[in-house]
Structure formats: structure tokens, C-alpha cells
Amino acid sequence: IKSGDDADSEAEANLKAARDLIGEAIRLAKPRADELIYCVIGAPAEASIHNREAIIEAAREHVDSVMLCSEPFAVAYGLDWLEDVLVVDIGAGTTDLCRMHGTMPEETDQVMFDIAGDAVDAELAKQIEATCKGAQFTVQMIKDIKERYGYVGDAPERVVVELPVDGKPTSFDLTDQLQAACSVLIEPILDGLKRLIATFDPEFQARLKERVLLAGGGSMVKGLDTAVEKAMNERLGGGKVIRIEEPIYGGSNGALKIAHDMPEDYWEQLK
């Protein structure tokens, strides 16, 4: 379920997909028939009330109680980094930023924008169409190239990929195209960081800048942590960016910890 309100038919299809996904995840966990099922679901930081209700509705037939939390909050909670931390969670459809300062984050502590993994894919496809005459590819091929070779900054090595041209595998150097595509992430991240730092307590802004966590699948782009840190030093007067050890599972690890720790008042009873 992405941000924004979809047309009714697409919204219903998305709801069914989310419902089926939750059901399959629970089936794989093999709960006993007498066990109550509690589910923590990560949502984009600025997900609308409509979309939050849709997520709860998707969970209704499978779980007894549900809790929604912002995805970057789940990352920070799982790492026990809850004081003066900025989390940048780069997913497929959205990049979510969350400012942690010892309490549950409020709306003003969070920023979301829709330049994320899908935007990198779209830019890479555009770059290939413009520079690789006759090259044929699919969305999945683009994702695979990005996930294997994506980088910003100095190229670790030349990236040469085979794509079919009129049925014949043909080698293309995509080094520059990959850098251009992956670089679309940097400016929005910097804008979000600047907004959350500038509106924080001035006494602790310097500490906040030194504790920026990169998470999510998009954080695996090679050199992204270094590039964001360099941009922070140039435009914000300093900064330290750390890529978390488990960028793919950081949010789910945090959600599991939240499920164990949160009292009953925080849960929404569905049954």
C-alpha cells in the first residue's frame, strides 16, 4: 500500500495483496490455534489516515491486535538509538526520515518524500534509453542492475552489463548512468535532514548531526553514506552518517522488539 489515494479498483487490489501477504507471513510463523496474534506493521512516516485505516483493515482477518509505527522509528527502536538520532529509511516507494529525542516521535519529527528505490529505477531506465541505442530491458532487469552495481561518488570499477539488442546480448558500460540514477537520492535526503535539524533544540543540533542512520534497501547503494556525509559537511557544517548493519531487516527487528515491549494500551484490538 503506497502513499496517496489510489483509484477504487487499484486500492482494492492493493488491499487484497496486503491482506494475503500478512496471512502468508503468519502461516509461515506456524502459530498454535490457541495463541493470540499481535502484529506490528511499519508504515511510511507521513502515511495518511486513509492509508493507515487500509493497513489495519488488511490485518483485521488475520490478527487479534495490531500496532502501526513509522518505519524509521522501528529501525531506531531495534538498535536502542532513541536519543538525538536521525534515521533515514530508504524503501521502494518512499524515503522516510525520523528525528528521535527520547519520546515517541510526533508528526513534526518526521519527513517523507517519494524519491526512493523506484525513482532510481525510473531514472536508470531513462538514462539507458537515452544512451544505449536499441537496448531492451524490463523493470526487474533494471532493479537487478541497481541492486548489484548501484553507487554514488567515485566508481569502484567500470560497470559493464549485457542487454539484448534485436535478440543479441550486447555489452554496455553503465557506469555513468548508474551514478546519475542513484544520485537522485542525495538532494531530497539532505533537504529532509536540514529541515529536521534546523527545527530541533539549538543546544542539541550538533549532536543530532553526528548521529544519522541510513537504513532500508536503498541504503545499500555503494558510497551513499559517504556522499550524504560529505554533503552535510559542505552545507550543514558537519555530520556523521552510519549505514546500519542490517539495512533490509532493521525495521522488522525493531518491530519485533516493539511487540515485546509495548503495553496493552498501545495496541488496537481487532477481535
Please state what every model-predicted region is.
Residues 93-94:
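Short acidic, Gly/Ser-rich segments with clustered Asp/Glu that frequently serve as metal-coordination loops
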Residues 1-90, 100-190, 194-212, 219-250, ...:
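Nucleotide/phosphate-binding catalytic cleft detector across ATP-hydrolyzing
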